Amino acid sequence: MQDILLIKYGELALKGDNRSFFENKLIKNIKHALSDFKEVKVEKTHGRIYVECDGDIEEVIERLKKVFGIVGITKAKKTDLNLDEIFKAAVELMKGHEGKTFKVETKRPNKSFPYNSMEVSRRVGAAVLKNIKNLKVDVHNPDVLLNVEIREMAFVYAGVIEGIGGLPLGTNGKATVLLSGGIDSPVAAWMMMKRGVEVEAVYFHSPPYTSERAKDKVVDLCKVLSQYGQRIKLHVVHFTDLQLEIYEKCPPKFTTIIMRRMMMKIAEKIAQKNGSMALITGESLGQVASQTIESLYVTNASVSMPIFRPLIGMDKTEIIDLAQKISTFEISIRPYEDCCTIFVPKHPATKPKLDKVIEAEEKMEYQKYIDDFEEEVIEV
């Protein structure tokens, strides 16, 4: 009898001819997450992925809870195809559940096993009742569902630890996220990673108006995001000169929207170089002046690449709740200004017209900044 973890996945099972691609990517990501555990083996057999580990199983579970594509993690016992061994595993798993109700459910893909599913369930239930006091059977609404699977080996398990869900990272291409250091953009990056998208990040740094601590905050956000499966390449773009050019030469009501358009143009150039197929932002409809539907239309027109906005229909409370869940919130609220919070006009345009914004942009020579920006690349 051996302690193992059964890995449950949801959407992957619906992927038809591509199912093996998604499963193999998930296995690769699990191995990466557990790469510093010496005594760990990850295997796939008959539509099941399981992890064998001789070390700290609780720490292994914590790592697996951050692997996209896993919907559930189950502590299980793997035994030989022997009823006595299955009984021992079932009794071991049910210890600590005294006073509760339970039900045994058996699946028997291995039809060569001499007992059918109903007979296995009946015999396992009887063994549990014989060895553990104060248990009752409830086939309709049990407190504990004890599962037995008869495959090339027997698997016995009860209860599921919730996983993070989504699709395995790396199954849906790459995108570049504009990471400001605020609450929203790291959540947006995380949501796209959950859909299988690898990310690189761009941060616009405006010294001396923004401090090194503001940049450090973004680096720390990337460190948190990297815990979900990949090292993140952060492009730190020096934005001061272009931002001052905008502030000095453009009408105040358009400075914010023009700044956003310049950021998009630079981010698109970086994205094209790194193989990204889209940009990601943390914009939420109507949250600020630059996030009205008119402003987003004008922003979109600055680039040809798709812009994904996974937070578009969320309110601030929902975004904060998710930021807290993924452990980025406390970093995001550190009191260091980023380039989006400096030079903010008193009355920004909320319904800008594209032709008027382009006319305002032409008052400055922005193309040289787009073509020859200075960047620092940090791999986190």
Curated annotation (Swiss-Prot):
Its EC number is 2.8.1.4. Pathway: Cofactor biosynthesis; thiamine diphosphate biosynthesis. Keywords: ATP-binding, Cytoplasm, Nucleotide-binding, RNA-binding, Thiamine biosynthesis, Transferase, tRNA-binding. Residues 58-162 form the THUMP domain. One of its GO terms (biological process) is thiamine diphosphate biosynthetic process. Pfam families: ThiI, ThiI_fer, THUMP. InterPro entries: Rossmann-like_a/b/a_fold, ThiI_AANH, ThiI_fer, ThiI_N, THUMP_dom, THUMP_ThiI, tRNA_STrfase, tRNA_sulfurtransferase_ThiI. It catalyses: [ThiI sulfur-carrier protein]-S-sulfanyl-L-cysteine + a uridine in tRNA + 2 reduced [2Fe-2S]-[ferredoxin] + ATP + H(+) = [ThiI sulfur-carrier protein]-L-cysteine + a 4-thiouridine in tRNA + 2 oxidized [2Fe-2S]-[ferredoxin] + AMP + diphosphate; [ThiS sulfur-carrier protein]-C-terminal Gly-Gly-AMP + S-sulfanyl-L-cysteinyl-[cysteine desulfurase] + AH2 = [ThiS sulfur-carrier protein]-C-terminal-Gly-aminoethanethioate + L-cysteinyl-[cysteine desulfurase] + A + AMP + 2 H(+). It comes from the Bacteria. One of its GO terms (cellular component) is cytosol. It is found in: Cytoplasm. ATP binds at L178, L179, Y203, F204, R260, G282, Q291. GO terms for molecular function: ATP binding; CCA tRNA nucleotidyltransferase activity; tRNA binding; tRNA-uracil-4 sulfurtransferase activity. Its main location: cytoplasm. It is an enzyme of class 2 (transferase). Belongs to the ThiI family. Catalyzes the ATP-dependent transfer of a sulfur to tRNA to produce 4-thiouridine in position 8 of tRNAs, which functions as a near-UV photosensor. Also catalyzes the transfer of sulfur to the sulfur carrier protein ThiS, forming ThiS-thiocarboxylate. This is a step in the synthesis of thiazole, in the thiamine biosynthesis pathway. The sulfur is donated as persulfide by IscS. This is Probable tRNA sulfurtransferase. The lineage of its organism: Bacteria, Bacillati, Bacillota, Clostridia, Thermoanaerobacterales.
